[in-house]
Amino acid sequence: MLCLPVFIILLLLASPAAPKSLETRIQNDLIRAGLTDADLKTEKGFLSGLLNVAGSVCCKVDTSCC
């Protein structure tokens, strides 16, 4: 009879140390993927903005590049 309470206490102590569930890992992966996609979109927007500025400067200097 003494083993049952000890077993329950050990079970309660071990449960928070359980590994993450599959759903939690998938959610973390999706969050990381979303952040990566956001970074890529920002870089593309930044590069296209630079190309637009370079094009407008080129058109002001020489009309053959427009």
From Swiss-Prot:
Entry-linked Pfam families: Chi-conotoxin (PF16981)
Keywords of the record = Disulfide bond, Secreted, Signal, Toxin
InterPro entries (UniProt xref): T-conotoxin
Q: Where does the record place it? A: Secreted
Pro-sequence positions in this chain? Answer: 20-54
Q: Which GO terms describe its molecular function?
A: toxin activity
Q: Which residues form the signal peptide?
A: 1-19
Q: Name one GO cellular component term.
A: extracellular region
Q: In which tissues is it expressed?
A: Expressed by the venom duct.
- What modifications does the entry list under PTM / processing? Contains 2 disulfide bonds that can be either 'C1-C3, C2-C4' or 'C1-C4, C2-C3', since these disulfide connectivities have been observed for conotoxins with cysteine framework V (for examples, see AC P0DQQ7 and AC P81755).
Domain free text: The cysteine framework is V (CC-CC).
- Which family is it part of? Belongs to the conotoxin T superfamily.
Protein's recorded name: Conotoxin Lt5.6
Q: Where does this protein come from, organism-wise?
A: Conus litteratus
